[in-house]
């Protein structure tokens, strides 16, 4: 009787494992298919945060704009602020990732290693919570795949159009209009730097009313963007 019970339990376990693998395969297929769907420039993706705002009837402001209609200094500032190796890595910055692992093994506080590509796939396909560290593991292969399929220019275009720049404010056109009352094409170097340093915490930081700390960060990014050179060459 005990042997029969163990056999039933094993069959039940195998059945659940098979179901879990099927679910995992389906979940992996969704971002794969969407990545190819998002290749054409006339397709305007939305982020999971936008979908959440729609589901909760919060509403949001997002006005898709071609990267050709964004002041180049904005993309340059974002690269120099968020991901200096954007034009050189393949979706994941292995040097930064290695540093995070070394810090974690040493018991030290870890620094961020999320690339613009990783942030893009997170915003498109994943929820920030409650996945936590599991989400980070999923981000890595997704970012590598996304980078292999998309051009750097298209990745940046999607990123700039789905990034959050304040409560209910998504994309650079809505951000430029909301914070400075101008289209993204007319952003100055200073405004671009302020918007770039807002990205890590868009709810708490206000580029239109920066505090001393945000102004110092913007000064640094403005200088770096002015000397970005080859670091932004993939967008040309």
Curated annotation (Swiss-Prot):
<comment type="function">
    <text>Peptidoglycan polymerase that catalyzes glycan chain elongation from lipid-linked precursors.</text>
</comment>
<dbReference type="GO" id="GO:0008955">
    <property type="term" value="F:peptidoglycan glycosyltransferase activity"/>
</dbReference>
<keyword id="KW-0812">Transmembrane</keyword>
<dbReference type="GO" id="GO:0005886">
    <property type="term" value="C:plasma membrane"/>
</dbReference>
<dbReference type="InterPro" id="IPR011812">
    <property type="entry name" value="Pep_trsgly"/>
</dbReference>
<keyword id="KW-0573">Peptidoglycan synthesis</keyword>
<keyword id="KW-0328">Glycosyltransferase</keyword>
<dbReference type="InterPro" id="IPR001264">
    <property type="entry name" value="Glyco_trans_51"/>
</dbReference>
<dbReference type="Pfam" id="PF00912">
    <property type="entry name" value="Transgly"/>
</dbReference>
<protein>
    <recommendedName>
        <fullName>Biosynthetic peptidoglycan transglycosylase</fullName>
        <ecNumber>2.4.99.28</ecNumber>
    </recommendedName>
</protein>
<keyword id="KW-1133">Transmembrane helix</keyword>
<comment type="pathway">
    <text>Cell wall biogenesis; peptidoglycan biosynthesis.</text>
</comment>
<keyword id="KW-0997">Cell inner membrane</keyword>
<keyword id="KW-1003">Cell membrane</keyword>
<feature type="transmembrane region" description="Helical">
    <location>
        <begin position="20"/>
        <end position="40"/>
    </location>
</feature>
<dbReference type="InterPro" id="IPR036950">
    <property type="entry name" value="PBP_transglycosylase"/>
</dbReference>
<keyword id="KW-0808">Transferase</keyword>
<comment type="similarity">
    <text>Belongs to the glycosyltransferase 51 family.</text>
</comment>
<dbReference type="GO" id="GO:0008360">
    <property type="term" value="P:regulation of cell shape"/>
</dbReference>
<keyword id="KW-0133">Cell shape</keyword>
<dbReference type="GO" id="GO:0071555">
    <property type="term" value="P:cell wall organization"/>
</dbReference>
<keyword id="KW-0961">Cell wall biogenesis/degradation</keyword>
<dbReference type="GO" id="GO:0009274">
    <property type="term" value="C:peptidoglycan-based cell wall"/>
</dbReference>
<dbReference type="GO" id="GO:0016763">
    <property type="term" value="F:pentosyltransferase activity"/>
</dbReference>
<dbReference type="GO" id="GO:0009252">
    <property type="term" value="P:peptidoglycan biosynthetic process"/>
</dbReference>
<dbReference type="InterPro" id="IPR023346">
    <property type="entry name" value="Lysozyme-like_dom_sf"/>
</dbReference>
<keyword id="KW-0472">Membrane</keyword>
